[in-house]
Amino acid sequence: MPPVEVDGWSRRIRVKTNAVGWAMSMVNASVEVDMTRHLSFSFPLYYSAVNYFRRDLKFRTFAVQPEFRWHFTRPEGLFVGAHFGTAYFNFATEGAWRYQTGYGNRPLFGGGLAAGYRKPLFRHHPAWEVEFSLGAGVYDVRYDRFYNEKNGPKEGTCHTTFIGIDNAGVTFSYSFRTGRRRGR
């Protein structure tokens, strides 16, 4: 039995990846599940263990940013979302310092709001989609600062509140209809 469609809508699961993350050498994947016609839940993961060609230039991270989304029409079109985010990081920018998650084990955490637009990538293959999104949030950040040299000693521990853009996406996805199929 095929999935039930109501007014042209059926529940879908999307498998996604963000091109902006890949441009930053961050492996990423996401799953989004339609909960109702207008509400969905997205769960992205980001990971990077990269030194950018040099020991003193790196952006290592592990982050998750689950988000509930409200779609104004169908899951295609305009949406807004509320998200929670947490991440571990270790980065250096060729300067005097290297920054690492506080105490090596306390992630940053916070949340924010996002908006975006999703549309089919191909007219004849609507399961392939592209979405454009931008989000901003507030995060509590505790980090350790080290001298940016081999085995550089710790200089101190800092605390700040980050307020700003916390995600940008050009995301490609493939969607699967959900539903039970019974054998004959």
Show which residues each predicted segment covers:
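Transmembrane beta-strand segments that form the barrel wall of outer-membrane beta-barrel proteins
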Residues: 9-24, 40-53
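C-terminal beta-signal and adjacent terminal beta-strands/loops
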Residues: 138-148
